[in-house]
């Protein structure tokens, strides 16, 4: 639970201008698009949660799909704005990121660029639509296990917050040159797949 709080705080710090603008003017096109994106995400998450679907066997596939999306979208140029249709497709992509190994931010940013949305808008939008996801995950965990606070939780929050900020900076640099990360993900995918098929070591 502390991870959700820290991740949300990191996103708020990184996207403070955009989030404050939405708080000041909540009734706007951007809010509507974020809600549209959240809809298919919530539906997929609810199906997986209530049906207790085990997706652990898809870890290798998740790594491979993330690598392919990053590679395919790396050199794409776009000038389009986010439309109703693209918001829903991004939401579907975000929902499918419940699959282990499939990066939520990597897949949503890549899909945005595939849809013709320019790089900076894609990154900003991906971080903004993560806010409802993080809040939803926090509430789900709180309803399941209750909410408690301790000094250990505070220390965990602080550690996760700074780790989250570093991860956000890494993601921003990643999309300048994702090829090294693509090689890393492809190697992970091959390792996990070989393990699942032959070795069963982990």
In which residue ranges do the predicted regions lie?
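Multi-pass membrane proteins that catalyze or facilitate reactions on polyprenyl-/lipid-phosphate substrates
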Residues: 1-100, 104-202
């Amino acid at each position: 639970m502390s991870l959700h709080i820290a991740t949300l705080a990191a996103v708020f710090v990184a996207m403070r201008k955009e989030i404050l603008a939405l708080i000041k003017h909540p009734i706007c096109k951007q809010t509507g698009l974020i809600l549209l994106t959240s809809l298919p995400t919530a539906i997929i998450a609810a199906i997986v949660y209530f049906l207790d679907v085990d997706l652990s066997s898809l870890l290798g596939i998740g790594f491979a799909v993330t690598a392919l999306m990053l590679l395919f979208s790396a050199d794409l140029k776009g000038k389009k704005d986010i439309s109703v249709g693209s918001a829903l497709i991004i939401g579907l992509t975000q929902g499918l990121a419940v699959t282990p190994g499939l990066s939520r931010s990597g897949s949503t940013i890549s899909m945005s660029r595939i849809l013709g949305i320019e790089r900076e808008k894609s990154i900003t939008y991906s971080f903004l639509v993560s806010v409802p996801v993080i809040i939803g995950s926090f509430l789900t965990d709180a309803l399941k296990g209750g909410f408690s606070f301790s000094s250990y939780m505070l220390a965990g929050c602080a550690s996760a917050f700074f780790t989250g900020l570093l991860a956000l900076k890494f993601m921003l640099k990643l999309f300048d040159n994702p090829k090294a990360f693509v090689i890393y993900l492809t190697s992970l995918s091959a390792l996990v797949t070989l393990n699942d098929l032959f070795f069963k070591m982990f």
